[in-house]
Design a protein with these regions (language model features):
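Conserved hydrophobic helix-helix packing surfaces used for dimerization/oligomerization
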Residues: 14, 190, 296-298
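G-domain G4 guanine-recognition motif of GTPases
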Residues: 67, 97-101, 118-135, 149-158, ...
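Conserved C-terminal guanine-recognition region of P-loop GTPase G domains, centered on the G4
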Residues: 52-60, 65, 75-148, 178-182, ...
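C-terminal effector/interaction modules appended to NTPase cores
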Residues: 1, 19-25, 203-392
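Long, well-ordered amphipathic alpha-helical subdomains in the mid-to-C-terminal portions
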Residues: 183-209
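Conserved G1/Walker A P-loop phosphate-binding module
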Residues: 1-78, 82, 86-89
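Canonical P-loop GTPase G-domain recognition
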Residues: 115-121, 126-182, 189-191, 220-229, ...
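Short, flexible loop segments at the rims of nucleotide/cofactor-binding pockets, characterized by
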Residues: 41, 70-76, 98-101, 169-171, ...
């Protein structure tokens, strides 16, 4: 992703669901105007999730996701279906392609989507070659409680209807969240203290830093940045103390001890706890750390799938802090990317990263899973603040 692109995590996620060879790939190609998904008459051509970022007038940045057919068979088919089901967790709006009156698989997916309160747009494709489109549309309406859009992806018929339907189904709260909330307003001075360690390769800032700076500029704040070792010098160079200081969780304690009394302090990870997740549940769950014992089991979940670094926060620094507090025998498991367990009951606590690479819907679905299983879940920044004795 370039610095001028909207991160996929901030885009409206529109997922196409349907049977094999129902025309999902053709439709995503028609919607995006590009041949990004392989099209074939052979069922099961799409073997993994295929995504395409684009802009839709009136909506803004979107991410279309093409899924494998949910009627796939065999061992490989089961793997494809599991990936399709995982896609539901990150879906903001679903396009459900319907084929005929054998509606068994469609009903299953429809029930899952409704359970997650995901808006559904039923679509009847291939009207250019069907003879019973109206009859089938009536049947689909009875099943979905909404009239399907009649289209032909191949002939580009009805594509604009889908774009309009997406606009109408846009969740009312989509895009309303912002990183810094009500912490700052126009003309406030904000200082970002950003340690440039091995996790931030030379010539690059990490995504949370980039997104936060951009938002602060949009809010017309006065934005200053410095590295940890230049924090004191930067404060001395300023005419007034910053209204807000934002730093990395790993240096939170050091910055807290040096900051002006009138300056508020938070971390990128704490900000992203509210931006992507449920900050109240995270804070409530962090208190569980006090009750952990060496026989407890903790799950640390990382959104990224990068190769582990020598001082990685999730794999090294956070486990070190936990074992220092709880004991060396504390069992800690690590998962990355989409490998998040369905069953969380073996764990006393889940600690998630800031999830800058995930959309809000995906993070909230993980929180919902933890809540349903009565498992506390917090994130890196909140956990580190608790372990360091800082609740700010």
């Amino acid at each position: 992703m370039s610095l001028t692109d909207t991160p996929n995590a901030n885009r409206l996620h529109i997922t196409l669901f349907g049977r094999r060879n129902s025309g999902k790939s053709s439709l995503i190609n028609a919607l995006t105007g590009q041949d990004i998904a392989l099209v074939s008459n052979t069922p099961g051509t799409t073997t993994d999730l295929v995504s395409k970022a684009m802009e839709i007038q009136g909506i803004g940045p979107c991410l279309f996701i093409d899924t494998p057919g949910f009627d796939d068979e065999g061992e490989l088919g089961e793997l494809r279906i599991s990936r399709t089901l995982k896609a539901i967790e990150k879906t903001d709006i679903a396009l459900l392609l319907c084929e005929d009156t054998t509606f068994f698989h469609e009903k299953e997916i429809l029930a899952l989507l409704k359970e997650k309160n995901i808006p559904v747009i039923p679509v009847l494709n291939k009207i250019d070659i069907r003879e019973n489109s109206d009859h089938l549309a009536t049947y689909i309406e009875e099943q979905c409680k909404i009239h399907p859009l009649l289209i032909s992806a191949k002939e580009k018929i009805g594509i604009e209807l889908i774009r309009q339907a997406i606009l109408e189904k846009l969740p009312s709260d989509f895009g309303q969240q912002n990183i810094t909330g009500k912490l700052v307003t126009e003309n406030d001075l904000v200082l970002l203290v950003m340690p440039q360690d091995i996790q931030a390769p030379k010539g690059r800032l990490i995504l949370p830093q980039v997104q936060t700076i951009r938002e602060l500029l949009d809010k017309k704040c006065l934005v200053m940045t410095c590295t940890t070792d230049k924090f004191s010098a930067t404060l001395q160079a300023l005419a007034r103390p910053p209204k807000l200081i934002i730093t990395d969780s790993q240096v939170f304690k050091a910055i807290y001890e040096q900051k002006p009394a009138e300056s508020e302090l938070t971390s990128f990870s704490v900000l992203f706890a509210g931006y992507k997740g449920d900050i109240h549940y995270y804070v409530e769950s962090a208190a569980v750390i006090e009750r952990l014992t060496e026989s407890s089991r903790v799950l640390i979940a990382e959104a990224c799938t990068h190769a582990p670094l020598s001082e990685d926060i999730g794999r090294v620094k956070l486990p070190r802090l936990l074992r220092k507090r709880i004991g060396e025998n504390l069992q800690i498991d690590m998962v990355a990317g989409t490998d998040f367990p369905q069953d969380l009951t073996p764990y006393s606590l889940v600690i998630h990263c800031g999830a800058c690479m995930f959309n809000r819907k995906y993070v909230l679905s993980r929180i919902e899973r933890a809540r349903e299983q009565h498992i506390p879940m917090t994130n890196y920044g909140v956990a580190i603040a608790f372990l360091n004795g800082n609740s700010g």
